Design a protein with these regions (language model features):
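Conserved SAM-binding motif I beta-strand of class I
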Residues: 2-7
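Short, solvent-exposed loop/turn segments at secondary-structure boundaries
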Residues: 8, 48-49, 70-74, 141
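S-adenosyl-L-methionine
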Residues: 11-59
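Flexible loop/turn segments at secondary-structure boundaries
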Residues: 12-13, 44-45, 66-68, 104-107, ...
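Mobile active-site "lid"/loop adjacent to the S-adenosyl-L-methionine
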Residues: 38, 55-85
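A structural alpha-helix within SAM-dependent methyltransferase catalytic domains
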Residues: 49, 80-87, 115
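C-terminal catalytic and target-recognition region of SAM-dependent MTase-like enzymes
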Residues: 81, 95-155
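Helix-to-beta-strand junctions that scaffold the AdoMet/dcAdoMet cofactor pocket
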Residues: 90-92
Length: 155
């Protein structure tokens, strides 16, 4: 098995590599087992698709697309496009996980955007589960509900 991590932030990539070393101190991973790409996620997914790369498990966890309420519509369009790109590189029977930390994107609208993206990729899906805040992260106001995610089996 192998991991390909894509991030445009070099600090995030360095932290990930450091974390890998902390958890697997006695294991040296080859470039085939663990690799990183410092690039925009949309660009990377487009290239991977054109290179005919397909994966068993794809995680889409971008930074917040809507930091202001007026960015909500653009954010939903971006989540749809990201899910479409992710679905195109997920193998049939593979798992696609899409997440959002955008406070201004309502949970139901996020899920609709993800599902629309999967369909626009010409793929079907079976929803496995939805995620949100853990019990140790209590919600006392609607704006606090910003973490959301969905696992889908791509068909």
């Amino acid at each position: 098995s192998s991991v390909l991590e894509i991030d445009s932030n070099p600090i995030a990539l360095a932290a990930s590599r450091k974390n890998l070393g902390l958890h697997f101190q006695n294991q040296n991973f080859s470039a085939e087992e663990f690799s990183q790409m410092k690039t925009d996620g949309f660009d990377a997914l487009s290239k991977l698709e054109s290179d005919n790369q397909r994966y068993d498990f794809v995680i889409l966890d971008p930074p917040a697309f809507a930091k202001r309420k007026k960015q909500t519509k653009a954010a939903l369009n971006a989540y749809t496009k990201l899910a479409q790109a992710g679905a195109k590189v997920t193998k049939k029977g593979g798992i696609l996980f899409a997440a959002s930390c955008s406070v201004h994107v309502q949970t139901a609208n996020f899920y609709k955007a993800v599902f629309a993206g999967i369909h626009s990729a010409g793929r079907g899906y079976e929803e496995i589960s939805r995620t949100g805040h853990a019990k140790d992260h209590p919600l006392t106001f609607r704006e606090g509900e910003y973490l959301k995610g969905v696992f889908c089996k791509i068909t």
